[in-house]
Amino acid sequence: MNQIDYLRISLIDRCNFRCQYCLPEDAELAYVRPQDLLTREEILTLVKNVFIPLGFRKFRLTGGEPLLHPEVVEIVRDIASLSATSDLALTTNGYLLDNLAEMLYEAGLRRINISLDSLDPDTFDKIIGNRGRSRWQKTWAGIQAAQRVGFDPLKLNVVVIPGINEAEVEDLAALTIEKRWHVRFIEFMPIGNGDLFQEKAWIANEELRGRIRAKWGLNEGQVRGNGPADVFQIPGAKGTIGFISQMSECFCDRCNRLRLSADGWLRPCLLNETGQIDLKTALRQGISPAEIRERVRELIELKAEINFKLRDSGTSSGIYTRTMSQIGG
């Protein structure tokens, strides 16, 4: 079994965007009550006393939108200050990043992923649900702030939706030519908006690779990250292009992560709901970190059987009960 050493931690299930593929505007959402979210202290306890003793060294803060969490800078500082932490990253939509980039960097964050599904303001606003006001410029300002502060690598995540932003693949890939940015194309998944998934389906990354290769050529990248992306590079480019192909290509045997939701549920597989365990309730019932650690160890041992490689969603109807923002992405 692959070494499991990477934990994705959702800080909050709320988001200031309503992206079509995640939190569509017409969806009714039951947000977690503030008192039911993991506290800063509980997150640190789990990281320090449960996950690090089990060999976890890499951590990523997600959401929802993690920058909406009032203590996000402090949580970054808490985890970054632990000597066992070898890598700490954060995924954001970038909208609030312009004002927070420097504070996050000073707190110890060095890697950041920013969602950018379009370079066209109108298309961007259509995807994120702009509610009558454009948000592209402020998001772009957040990306510029992250570069200015010194985040390296700076990664841009792109979810390609047929008929909406698929024509921009080459333009987004071109961002890597003059900048040391990493653009990652992520196949559209059936979590969050099953109706849109059924209507639009998804485009296999092999097709996108073919389009980029036809325009510039494409070399296999020399550097791999912590995740499942297959990395390539346009000849002579400063940055790289990654493809996360969770729908068309099975990468379960490379999976090295668990996911902790904002309300404390530990999930072994993004696309399979089997085997989740409630760590928050265990903590609040006074169960010791040592006993919780054993429960997590048992889940890790089962992870290879739970992974999505058999295309089992772990649901009775095939419909996921939690959205991407609730899971933590």
Curated annotation (Swiss-Prot):
Superkingdom field: Bacteria
Chemical reaction(s) catalysed: GTP + AH2 + S-adenosyl-L-methionine = (8S)-3',8-cyclo-7,8-dihydroguanosine 5'-triphosphate + 5'-deoxyadenosine + L-methionine + A + H(+)
Binding site for S-adenosyl-L-methionine: 21, 64, 115, 189
Keyword Heme: no
Binding-site residues, GTP: 8, 60, 91, 155, 257-259
GO molecular function: 4 iron, 4 sulfur cluster binding; cyclic pyranopterin monophosphate synthase activity; GTP 3',8'-cyclase activity; GTP binding; metal ion binding; S-adenosyl-L-methionine binding
Pathway: Cofactor biosynthesis; molybdopterin biosynthesis
Protein residues bound to [4Fe-4S] cluster 1: 15, 19, 22
Residues where [4Fe-4S] cluster 2 binds: 252, 255, 269
Cofactor: record remark: Binds 2 [4Fe-4S] clusters. Binds 1 [4Fe-4S] cluster coordinated with 3 cysteines and an exchangeable S-adenosyl-L-methionine and 1 [4Fe-4S] cluster coordinated with 3 cysteines and the GTP-derived substrate.
Signal peptide: none
A single GO BP: Mo-molybdopterin cofactor biosynthetic process
Enzyme Commission code: 4.1.99.22
Domain Radical SAM core positions: 1-229
Subunit composition and interactions: Monomer and homodimer.
Function field: Catalyzes the cyclization of GTP to (8S)-3',8-cyclo-7,8-dihydroguanosine 5'-triphosphate.
Name by which UniProt lists this protein: GTP 3',8-cyclase
The species this protein was found in: Microcystis aeruginosa (strain NIES-843 / IAM M-2473)
